[in-house]
């Protein structure tokens, strides 16, 4: 819940001096990216900018305090301020900020700018007291903000010092409007206007000018002169002499003498007690000061000129001038030290009554009241956890003694979930074990089950599925239905374990249950996770169309709940890319993989390994080996600099081994095979994939017998577990083994099985990646004209893809190739004496690649009759009568040139 006063522009008071010369300068702010107003405290920064902002509807105001160094809090208020300025135009950004569903501040701002691209009128955001920001993450994000904000957007920053926002760069590019303390200092005319409005009897212009010069135009000093003159009934000139040359560091003594010592005891205590509040309203004042009418007292203090300012148009919220507030808080610690804890307790209670637990925690911490802090956390900690107030929770839990946590074990559970969210898995188990050992008496069974649900999540994250399953089952046996969050966690973990064990049907059922529970209780990250798992299971079962439809539901959930910046979004676009790749939609697959990398742009590069693997796959399917090699260099660098799940390693190894196969790099394959551990089982798609990599390397090295043993066992497991996509892949690799070992009948048999199974999976690229050996077999099957209609159609599609992407490596008779061919000592004499034209060589290559006459005409952009003439001529020169004879002739030429066809 956001405090309204932090988003309200200060109210312009009637007796303030209108700074016309500075307002004229600010009137051109819309021509700059940044308007920066800097000066020490008390020079009138906020007053000036509030005057300038008056009448501007499309302006947001954000008043900072020390708590805004938490980046989640900063983001929530900043987006809320822009929402006020735009009348709710940026709803997606607002939802993401409220739910903390963004990867980083920069990614949230990127989404904001996408929405603001449709906003075409001038727009302003004022951030007051930016000097309070010390978090470098926020500074970095605001530099990003300034670089990328729309042209019609102006950021206005008020600060006591020069903020770390890349000011020099903006200044050089003339994108910075600056107002500093010299300009903010009152001139003689403004000082005269000021005194005329504040003092009952006017003073001469010369005297006013002298006083202005004495204090160097410092607005706070002028205000103190007027206040002192009114309170003490002395001349303003006397006060001015005392303030001459004073600065903020020496102001405390003056404020004691001239302000605090000149108010009655009741007002003094009111000022000191209320100063602990960063913002205040009637209810807070009543509770903290004991005054019966807080609003009336606030208005009275304001009338006395005691540095109190309204924070909103309704006059409900007030705050002290920062300089005066800081002074009062310091005096409060000295004068009311014994009462201070009780004052903070009263403030915490009032904030709680108004529904602001974060502010209440701030005061409970200041009071050092562990019992109050404990009670607030017991009632509100999980809500704060779900809103990602993690830093505040961590600070609060550290402030509680361990004995207090043991007496309230749900707080131990909260601390453990905090550790889990930070991937501190070993610490989670240590903490829970210590708590179970030291909790006095019999531990509540439900709480023990919640501990086990969390332990199960830690175990699966840490790659220990057996322990995860045991703990998840224990948790589900003991958890009441009302304990929905832990039940969702345990059900999800159990489903994931069954997925790892290859029990796909039961795993799918549990993930569907997880989705249903998570949607019902608005636990959106688990709803998304369960959909991703369902899609992976359906893919493994060979139901790729069902997997596609599940992914569509996941994309819709992301859109509805603004989950675009969760790291899980990358998982979804990655499995979408895998599916698109399988269907040979390579451009879309590559785009999905790149969007996954974009989602992870603010994370460690190692997180991008899976998407980078997919980019390599796309290059390999296209036959673009140069690009694949470049991407593999980066991939292998990442592999050497991180720890990865076996699934990630298997996918990365897959593209490496395929690349070695396509380039004939037996040395790399042999070295990899020597050092790669062989999995103990093959009962899920991760392990099947790594065993398949091993078999592919063995085939490349001519180790056909061990490769056949591996593949037959993989097929047996895949059939028993219904891992149909893996079975389809295994059959294709077995086909290559049989083909290369000369067992042509066996090769044809398993290829027919693979084509039939592809009617279910829709696989295309898995065939294409096998290149020319696959193309030769498909040509033969097509020419036999015995394939069923669906298999015939798929074979033709696969052949077209191979021709499109792999022809240049095997069958593209370009000028360089032809020149080398004609100079070969074994070239047939007929070709030497009746050489083909360059066009006829191209036609021969396309015939060899399986193109029909119409397809050749389309490829070469000539008429079909012209192609017939070329074919007739080349048949005559080659001494052949039929297309199949031409194909065999081309194959002999390629073999002669050393191509393994």
Swiss-Prot record:
- Domain HTH luxR-type as annotated: residue spans: 829-894
The GO biological-process annotations, alphabetized, read as: positive regulation of carbohydrate metabolic process; positive regulation of DNA-templated transcription
Q: Does the keyword Transcription regulation apply?
A: yes
SUPFAM superfamilies membership: C-terminal effector domain of the bipartite response regulators, P-loop containing nucleoside triphosphate hydrolases, TPR-like
- Residues noted as binding ATP in the record, renumbered to the chain: 39-46
Description of activity control: Activated by ATP and maltotriose, which are both required for DNA binding.
UniProt xrefs under CDD domains: LuxR_C_like
Q: Which cysteines are joined by disulfide bonds?
A: none
Identify one Pfam family in the record.
GerE
Query: Keywords in UniProt for this one?
Result: Activator, ATP-binding, Carbohydrate metabolism, DNA-binding, Nucleotide-binding, Transcription, Transcription regulation
* An annotated Gene Ontology molecular function: ATP binding
Q: Which domain of life is it from?
A: Bacteria
DNA-binding region, residues: 853-872
User: What does the function comment of this entry state?
Assistant: Positively regulates the transcription of the maltose regulon whose gene products are responsible for uptake and catabolism of malto-oligosaccharides. Specifically binds to the promoter region of its target genes, recognizing a short DNA motif called the MalT box.
PANTHER family this protein is in? DNA-BINDING TRANSCRIPTIONAL ACTIVATOR DEVR_DOSR (PTHR44688:SF16)
Alphabetical list of HAMAP family matching this protein: HTH_type_MalT
The subunit field of the Swiss-Prot or TrEMBL record says: Monomer in solution. Oligomerizes to an active state in the presence of the positive effectors ATP and maltotriose.
Record-stated family: Belongs to the MalT family.
Name under which the protein is recorded: HTH-type transcriptional regulator MalT
Species per Swiss-Prot/TrEMBL record: Salmonella paratyphi B (strain ATCC BAA-1250 / SPB7)
